Structure formats: C-alpha cells, structure tokens
C-alpha cells in the first residue's frame, strides 16, 4: 500500500504533507516552496500551474485563473459568483450544467477541472519527493462547505487521478495537528481565516481524541476580499488624482494592482506604513502614468474593519451551539494566512478574552492534519479518534413549502436518521422527495441538494401510506437519501452529488484528459532535457575546438563541425529521438577530440602532462628546491 498524502487545497495557496514514520513531513515543490500558489494559466503552447503560473499573471491576466475554490459547487447565477465576476480578470460563465465555470480561449473549464490541475501538480510533486506513485489522498475543505462543494472537491481529486480516502474539515485537520500527541484535555477554538473562506470550530482535544462540538463560518469571506478593498481604494485614489482614469477597466493594470495589494497587505502586518509603487501603470494622450501611493496600517484597518467584524457572529453561534462561553475556551488556535493581520488577532483576543495560540504554522497546519488523518486511515497512526460534525442541517420539503429537518447541524458524523411521512392527497401514486441543506424555515430559502420520486404507491386515502425517509451522512460529509413505502417495501434512493454537478461520464472524460495531459507533460520534459543536453554538448565541443585551434586534425574538425551544425538544426524540433541520436553521434566524435587533446598534452610534457592530484604526492617535485629554515620559538 502506497502513502496517503494530505492536501490542503486552498483558495490562494495549497500545501501537501505526508507521514514519514510517526512524523508529518511537508513536501516542498520543485521551486523550493513549502506552499504552491493555487493558480493555473494557459498560454498559446502550454498549461502552467503554481509559481510559474502566478509569475506570468500580469502579462496574461485573462488566461490566468486564481481563487477557483470560490466557484466550487456553486451555480453560475449564484449571488457570490456574480460578486466575484465583477472583480475577476478572467471570464466566469455558466457551464453546460449550470454550474459556475471559467472560460479560457473559448473553452469552458469547470471549477473541479481547474482544481484537478492544481491537485495534479501537488500529486506529481509528492511522487517526485517520495520516489513512488501516489494514488490516495486526504483533502481538506472549509468546515462550512455544503454537500455540493464537498462533492465537487472529491470530483476534482478523481480527475487528478487520486482516490480521495477522506474529505476532512480544515479546522478539524488543524486541531488534529495541534492536538497530536497532546495528553491534556482542552476545549479549543480553531479560528480559520484563509484566502477565500472563514471557519470557526469549537473542539475538545486530548488523550488522542479530537471531538468537534460545533462549527460555523462564511464560505465567501477571506484574503481575496481584503485584497479587493485595497485594490478599490487604489483605483479610486488614482482616478481622483489623474483626471478620472479608471484602472479597473484595464485587466493588465488590475492584475498588477492585485499583486501590489497582496504585497501591501502582508507588509502592513509587520510595518506601520508601506509604499505602493507601480510605474507605467497606464497611459493617456499626455503620456505614461505612474501609481505611487503610501498606505498606512491604520488606513488598511479602516478599509477592512467590517470584514473582520463579519467573523464575530459565526464565533458567537458556534459557541452557543457548543453550549460554551468564550471564557470556557482554553486555547484559540489561529489558522490561515489572514490571521497574521494584527487587526484580526486583536479582534480574536477581544472576543475570546485571551491571547490566541500562535504555536502552529497557519499556512501548513491544515495539510499536516490531513496527513495525520491519512496516517490514521492507513493504520500508521494508531489510537487517535476523530469525531467530526455536519455543518448544516439536512431535511426535506413538506406540505406548504416547509423545510423539515431530519439531521440538525453539528450532528456527529457518520450518522443515519429516519422519519416517517405520509401523502398529502387521496390516491396519491407517488411522492417527490426534495432534499435540502440549510437553516431557514422555508424550503425555498435553503439549498437544493437533489430530488427523486418514489412511485408505485397503492391507492389510499391521504395520511394512510407510510413513507420512511432516511438520511445517511458518511465520514466525508456526503449525503445519501432513501425513501421507502413501508406498506409495499418499495424503495428508492439517491446519492446526492453536486447540484447540477459533473456527471459520471463527464468525470471519466476529464480523468482521461488529465492522464493524456500528464503523458504530454512527460514528453515535454523529455524534450526539454534532450534539448538542454544537446545545447550543453554543442557548447563544450565548440569550446574544445577553439582551445585546440590549428593543432586539431582538419578532417576530424570538419566531421565534428558537420555534426554540431546538424544537432543545432534539431534544437527547435519536437523530435526527441532525432535530437538524442544526433547528440550520441556528436558525443562519439567528441571522444576522438578528447583523445587528440590528451595525446597533444602528453607530447608537450609539463605540469599538465603528468599532473597528479594535489596533496603530498603532487607537491614533492616542487619541494625539492625548497630550503628548510631554522627558527627559534620566542616565549612571551
């Protein structure tokens, strides 16, 4: 059995860990980073993922996709998607199934498909680190993700070639890492403010048991919103100072502003003031325009004060659901890059009445916990019990459009709950089961997870048939619903997948595309390596020819130069085999060149001809003419 990796699939950055023995270990990417930007870019020739995609975003804004996690499991017409469209330099559309998708070069990509590209890179990085194929993973999601968003994440894993052994809530993963090997019993609050989402979870940790008491949050609140406030401020100030020029209409300028806003936000976590300096940001008939502006921490805090305040109400609700007060919380653990912001830390301290615990790395602790969960599933980590909860209530629509709950929010999972219903009309031949998730009293105000029909009900007066509806939530938080006519024993069930999400056929098609792309990547890597090797061989050979000058045999020189010309002509070709063959031929000819070089050195004599390694043996010849000197030690 191979390793089960732990992946934190983040809005802004992603991270991957693995258990090595009893210790979780961070897997660095080839660029040397411990986290990888959750960015995918498309160029005319290739697809880029991670740091390399982020670096070219300014020059390629419309084809560089970031923060796609915000679109996972959402409909194209959802209000949150509409808000994101206003600020996004890339094009967001409704896919064929109605879900939010990204359109690049005329082709729509679903959110799970883009996420799969990020997961595919993390998988490849893990394989390079471990030296073995990786097929299994534990992937984290925000605790307040609904069923559609969880299913979309699982689909992304499948497309990337990963068997997702468990979907685990991010605060739960963080608490697992925090509580790993801790014996003391503690009530902790995990305050998780990341790039795109906010979660608060109340847990009991100790003696290798992690039990979630309650969770709450906002799946559309995070660092991207803070960045946007800075961008809007910079755009407004620039417009005011430059005769109404609107940078928001220039996608390339907008991308530069985004990078500057992110940097300024980070700088102001450690300094009181920073300067935003973007020369040649745009131009008009009078010439180029430059953006130079100072931004203070006080100004930033004023811009984002309401965003920070939005984290408070979920904290209150989570504490109430857990039946605890802020004073009963032993530790507040900060997770997510945004918790580095002093204003966030100050508000957390004020609400909970204590300084937050900063002992964990907010960027990595979630992936670390996912790896520990992978170790538990693989049997490598023993005696650790994890008890998670479902974040939202589940139920069905009943007469009058009422939402009838079967499973209350913060119920420990996995769980199963049944309830008996009846018909609303005489001789009703079927019932429609409308499955919903949410907290509002009316069905229309909650999120539809799915619908299915139970048919073949025998004619009877209303109120007579007995229809048992059962909800089953697995450890991933994914829902199965069944309806059974207790009179006939007839049963109908549905496994809830992402609402209007990817069908099985679509997933299989995307899996095949991802595999084909992986093969293409491998071939591309082979081509790059062959070209680099050939280029190095050409350089070395030409240098040797120059060094030998007219001492080189004319016929041999002509033969080698012919082979160099032939190989150089192949450097831009896509034929790996031809490049390798020409490289081998040049290498063989170069061996003769080396032989001639050594022969000439031997004939010439001198230090090069009989040179020995440095040290005693090589130093003796020179020492023959050295006179030993007498000396007297002078005592002080």
From Swiss-Prot:
Gene3D superfamilies: 1.20.1270.10, 3.30.420.40, Actin, Chain A, domain 4, Substrate Binding Domain Of DNAk, Chain A, domain 1. The lineage of its organism: Bacteria, Pseudomonadati, Thermodesulfobacteriota, Desulfovibrionia, Desulfovibrionales. Residues 597-636 are annotated as: Disordered. Keywords: ATP-binding, Chaperone, Nucleotide-binding, Phosphoprotein, Stress response. The keyword Aminoacyl-tRNA synthetase does not apply. Belongs to the heat shock protein 70 family. Induction: By stress conditions e.g. heat shock. Residues 600-616 have a biased composition (Low complexity). SUPFAM superfamilies: Actin-like ATPase domain, Heat shock protein 70kD (HSP70), C-terminal subdomain, Heat shock protein 70kD (HSP70), peptide-binding domain. This is Chaperone protein DnaK. Acts as a chaperone. Pfam families: HSP70. It comes from Nitratidesulfovibrio vulgaris (strain ATCC 29579 / DSM 644 / CCUG 34227 / NCIMB 8303 / VKM B-1760 / Hildenborough) (Desulfovibrio vulgaris). GO terms for molecular function: ATP binding; ATP-dependent protein folding chaperone; unfolded protein binding. It comes from the Bacteria. The modification Phosphothreonine is found at residue 197. PROSITE patterns: HSP70_1, HSP70_2, HSP70_3. Residues 625-636 have a biased composition (Acidic residues).
């Amino acid at each position: 059995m191979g390793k089960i990796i732990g992946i934190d699939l983040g809005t802004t950055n992603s991270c991957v860990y693995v258990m090595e023995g009893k210790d979780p270990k961070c897997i660095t990417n080839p660029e040397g980073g411990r986290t990888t930007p959750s960015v995918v870019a498309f160029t005319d020739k290739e697809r880029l993922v991670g740091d390399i995609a982020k670096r070219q975003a300014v020059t390629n804004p419309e084809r560089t996709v970031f923060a796609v996690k915000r679109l996972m499991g959402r409909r194209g017409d959802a209000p949150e998607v509409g808000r994101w469209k206003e600020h996004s330099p890339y094009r967001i559309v409704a896919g064929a199934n109605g879900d939010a998708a990204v359109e690049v070069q005329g082709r729509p990509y679903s959110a799970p498909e883009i996420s799969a590209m990020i997961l595919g890179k993390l998988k490849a990085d893990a394989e390079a680190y471990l030296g073995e194929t990786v097929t299994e993973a534990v992937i984290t999601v925000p605790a307040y993700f609904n069923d559609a968003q969880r299913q979309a994440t699982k689909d992304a894993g499948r497309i990337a070639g990963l068997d997702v052994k468990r979907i685990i809530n991010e605060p739960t993963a963080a608490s697992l890492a925090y509580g790993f090997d801790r014996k003391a019993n503690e009530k902790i609050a995990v305050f998780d403010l990341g790039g795109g989402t906010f979660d608060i979870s109340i847990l009991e940790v100790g003696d290798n048991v992690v039990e979630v008491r309650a969770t709450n949050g906002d799946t559309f609140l995070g660092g991207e919103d803070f960045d946007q406030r800075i961008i809007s401020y910079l755009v407004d100030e620039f417009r005011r100072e430059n005769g109404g020029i609107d940078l928001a209409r220039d996608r390339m300028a907008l991308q530069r502003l985004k990078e500057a806003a992110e940097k300024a936000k980070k700088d102001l976590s450690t300094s009181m003031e920073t300067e935003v300096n973007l020369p040649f940001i745009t131009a008009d008939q009078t010439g180029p325009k430059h953006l130079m502006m100072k931004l203070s921490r006080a100004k930033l805090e004023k811009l984002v004060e309401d965003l920070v305040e939005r984290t408070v109400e979920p904290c209150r609700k989570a504490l109430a659901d857990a039946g605890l007060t802020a004073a009963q919380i032993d530790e507040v653990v900060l997770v997510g890059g945004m918790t580095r912001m002093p204003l966030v830390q100050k508000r957390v301290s004020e609400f909970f009445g204590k300084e937050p615990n900063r002992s964990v790395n907010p960027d990595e602790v979630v992936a670390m916990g996912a790896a520990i969960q992978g170790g538990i599933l693989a049997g490598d980590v023993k005696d650790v019990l994890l008890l998670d909860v479902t974040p939202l209530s589940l139920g069905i629509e009943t007469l009058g459009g009422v939402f009838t709950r079967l499973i209350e929010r913060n119920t420990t999972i996995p769980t199963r709950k049944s309830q008996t219903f009846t018909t609303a009309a005489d001789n009703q031949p079927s019932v429609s089961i409308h499955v919903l998730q949410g907290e509002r009293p009316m069905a229309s105000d909650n999120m539809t997870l799915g619908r299915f029909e139970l048919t073949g009900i025998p004619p009877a007066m209303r109120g007579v048939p007995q229809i048992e509806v059962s909800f089953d939530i697995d450890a991933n938080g994914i829902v199965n619903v069944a309806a059974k006519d207790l009179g006939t024993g007839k049963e109908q069930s549905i496994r809830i997948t992402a609402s209007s999400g990817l069908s099985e056929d679509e997933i299989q098609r995307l899996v095949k595309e991802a595999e084909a792309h992986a093969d293409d990547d491998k071939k591309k890597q082979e081509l790059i390596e062959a070209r680099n090797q050939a280029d190095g061989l050409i350089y070395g050979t030409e240098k040797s020819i120059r060094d030998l000058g007219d001492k080189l045999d004319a016929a041999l020189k002509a033969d080698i130069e012919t082979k160099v010309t032939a190989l150089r002509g192949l450097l831009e070709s896509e034929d790996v085999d031809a490049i390798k063959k020409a490289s081998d031929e040049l290498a063989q000819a170069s061996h003769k060149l080396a032989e001639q070089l050594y022969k000439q050195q031997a004939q010439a004599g001198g230090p090069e001809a009989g040179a020995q390694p440095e040290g005693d043996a090589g130093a003796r010849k020179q020492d023959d003419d050295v006179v030993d000197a007498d000396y007297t030690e002078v005592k002080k």
